[in-house]
Amino acid sequence: MKAWYKLEKHHSQLFIMYSGELEVQAKRKAIAILQDEINRILNAGRVLSTLPKMLVNKDKAGIKVALEQIASIEEEVENLRRKITRDVADVGGLILNRENILNTAYTMDEIGGYITGIAFKLSNIKVSTIKTSHLDKDLTELIELVVDQIYKLNEIIRSLNVDSGKSIELAQETQKIERDIDTKYRIMTITVLNGITDTKELLLMKDVIEAIEEMADKCQEVSDSFILLALSLWFERRIIRK
């Protein structure tokens, strides 16, 4: 009886270890796709940051190329989101926190959509409006702050499979960047309201800076999701080692 009990216990432990290893493998595959997704979003953000200067310089060819690049990247991000949805569906209940992974993929997809929307609205604002109170420089700085935030997300996900603790530290840095973005956003809002008299132009510019701030909020949501993934991976590694 004791021998049978020990054998059953041994088999149960092996099954738990095997299931745990499979889950970690499935999660690593999902994280690799998320990393691919965030890389593309980072590239789109960098292209977006060049747009204000091109608009001021009336670089029509450059603007056209930038808008095409951003639209193409958004499509790539959507395809990656569909891929991760299929992959997570295929493994079924193997990944315990699959909802978190899917939500992260969809939120990153939204960030890609924000970049496309901002680029479109920005390209339809008059040059004279963008030059108001040096808004072109302020816009570039605001977008670059969000690009810094996305870059941090890229660093976080790169460290997820290597050092979960490092991921959590990096996630805290995104919060500081978000606070800087909020401060810059408030200052720019006052500048826009005081400096732009044309109603249509005012609404367009206000929409642009609000969308940039909302995009930063979405980046913070992704950062929070990465913390949950980091904690999950750390916990699973502890179980497998035991």
Model features per residue range: what roles?
Residues K2-K242:
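Cytosolic, long alpha-helical scaffolding segments
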